[in-house]
Amino acid sequence: VYEQVSIEVPQSVEAPVVIITGASEIEASTIQALSFGPDVXKEADVEAMIKAVDAWGQVDVLINNAGITRAGVIGLQKNINVNAIAPGFIASDMTAKILETIPLGR
């Protein structure tokens, strides 16, 4: 099952699949929301997400809940990339966008 509310339809879904519950309920409400299921370790996915934010105008809430668990040496590196490094890059990029549109102290 794959549910995504976005301006861009994913070309393919590869394992593991991200399940976003409630996205259709949010879409049906009066709230404007955009949810993504990108691979946070892929720069192109993160850039596409940031471009979508540019199209929408601002970020009011950012929930970054990426996380994986893999075994072995290669798995450990992927764990570090997805769980520790990528969220920092996303937060930095999104923080810059937030500061462009929302005055400090709000």
Curated annotation (Swiss-Prot):
Name of protein: 3-oxoacyl-[acyl-carrier-protein] reductase
Pfam family, one: adh_short
Record-listed E.C. numbers: 1.1.1.100
InterPro entries cross-referenced by the UniProt entry: NAD(P)-bd_dom_sf, SDR, SDR_fam
Signal peptide stretch: none
Family from the record: Belongs to the short-chain dehydrogenases/reductases (SDR) family.
Record bears the keyword tRNA-binding: no
Pathway(s) of this molecule: Lipid metabolism; fatty acid biosynthesis
Quaternary state and interactors: Homotetramer.
General remark: Exhibits a marked preference for acyl-carrier protein derivatives over CoA derivatives as substrates.
Keywords for the protein's UniProt record, in alphabetical order: Chloroplast, Fatty acid biosynthesis, Fatty acid metabolism, Lipid biosynthesis, Lipid metabolism, NADP, Oxidoreductase, Plastid
Enzyme class at the top of the EC tree: oxidoreductase
Tissues where this protein is expressed: Mesocarp.
The reaction(s) this protein catalyses: a (3R)-hydroxyacyl-[ACP] + NADP(+) = a 3-oxoacyl-[ACP] + NADPH + H(+)
Subcellular location: Plastid, Chloroplast; Plastid
GO-annotated biological processes: fatty acid biosynthetic process
Source species, domain of life: Eukaryota
Gene Ontology, cellular component aspect: chloroplast
